[in-house]
Structures are given as structure tokens and as C-alpha cells.
Design a protein with these regions (language model features):
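Bacterial N-terminal signal peptides that target proteins for export
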Residues: 1-8
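Thiol-/selenol-based redox modules, centered on thioredoxin-like
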Residues: 137-174
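Structural micro-motif
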Residues: 29-30, 113-117, 132-142
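Short active-site neighborhood of thiol/selenol oxidoreductases, capturing the structured segment around
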Residues: 43-68
């Protein structure tokens, strides 16, 4: 009985440490190999050249933060010579009963309209390499400096206060 209790306590401590590590910022991250919309290998664009605003999105919840993201895009609130933004579709966490190729086609039709850069992560490559923790059913917004430091992360629906913190953090990188 004592062994089971000790194992449970140990497991809880390990999970807490992993969760805390996943959220500690700033921290170094590396350029990760992902896929383009044609399922070809690709690296994160502008890595080391510009600061990056990355939207890592579970396709099950593409509308989380939609009003805020639309506001940023339409007002060009975070546009600047030192920052670029792009999206990465978190395909692994999608429960959609459609093949990944259909999700890629939907994304491709959207990029044709707005010129956005969208990549795909078919197997948690980004979330694992960067120790992001659970990103299922989350619209994850991140800021990475051109030096490769993850300086901001928000997962899920952002409060007004969190939106303001994001804008303040991004303003420093423009």
C-alpha cells in the first residue's frame, strides 16, 4: 500500500514539474521541421531573421480568439518590419472524421484569399520540441524572438487582460 501511495505522489510531482516547465518563459526553442500544405517537409519561415507571431491551432477550434485575431489583422495593429506572423495547424489533435488532406485543402483555399502562410504539424512536432504541454482544443498564440526565445504563450480563449498582455509583448518585437 505504501508503495502505491509513494508512486502516486511521485507521479503527481513529475506531472507538476513537467507542467511548470512547459510554462516557464522565456526559454530557448529551436526551428522545427513541419510540413507545408502539400505535406512536404518545411522549416519555420523567417527563423532567425524576424521575430515570430505563431498561431498553433487545433482545427477543431479555429474560431477561438477569432474576434481578436480579426482585429489584429484588419487594423495591422502588430505589423512592423521586425515581426512576421504565420499559422501552424495542429493536425494530431483534430478529431474531425475527415482526412488531414481535407483540412489542408480548406487551409489552402483560405491562404489563397488572404495570402497567409500556413504550415502543418501532423504529429505534435512543435508542441513536443517546445514543451508546450496539452494543446488539444486550443488556439495557441506564441511569440518567438529572432534569437529563438519563446517569450509569450497563451492557450485557448484569451481574456481581455490576456489580449492586452499579448499586444504589449508583441509591441516590443515590432
Amino acid at each position: 500500500m505504501k508503495i502505491k501511495t509513494l508512486l502516486l505522489v511521485f507521479a503527481a510531482v513529475m506531472l507538476f514539474n513537467i507542467s511548470a516547465e512547459a510554462q516557464s518563459l522565456p526559454r530557448r526553442v529551436r526551428n522545427v521541421e513541419v510540413q507545408d500544405l502539400d505535406a512536404q517537409k518545411a522549416r519555420l519561415p523567417w527563423w532567425g531573421e524576424k521575430n515570430l507571431m505563431i498561431f498553433y491551432v487545433d482545427p477543431d477550434v479555429p474560431k477561438q480568439n477569432d474576434e481578436f485575431i480579426t482585429h489584429i489583422e484588419e487594423t495591422k495593429r502588430l505589423a512592423g518590419p521586425n515581426i512576421e506572423g504565420f499559422g501552424i495547424i495542429n493536425l494530431k489533435d483534430s478529431w474531425y472524421p475527415v482526412p488531414d488532406s481535407v483540412i489542408r485543402q480548406i487551409a489552402e483555399s483560405r491562404t489563397a484569399k488572404n495570402g497567409a502562410t500556413i504550415l502543418c504539424d501532423p504529429d505534435h512536432w512543435v508542441s513536443s520540441a517546445w514543451r508546450l504541454g496539452d494543446c488539444n482544443d486550443k488556439f495557441v498564440i506564441m511569440l518567438v524572438t529572432k534569437a529563438g526565445e519563446l517569450v509569450y504563450i497563451s492557450k485557448g480563449e484569451m481574456s481581455v487582460e490576456e489580449q492586452q498582455r499579448f499586444i504589449e509583448a508583441a509591441d516590443k518585437l515590432r
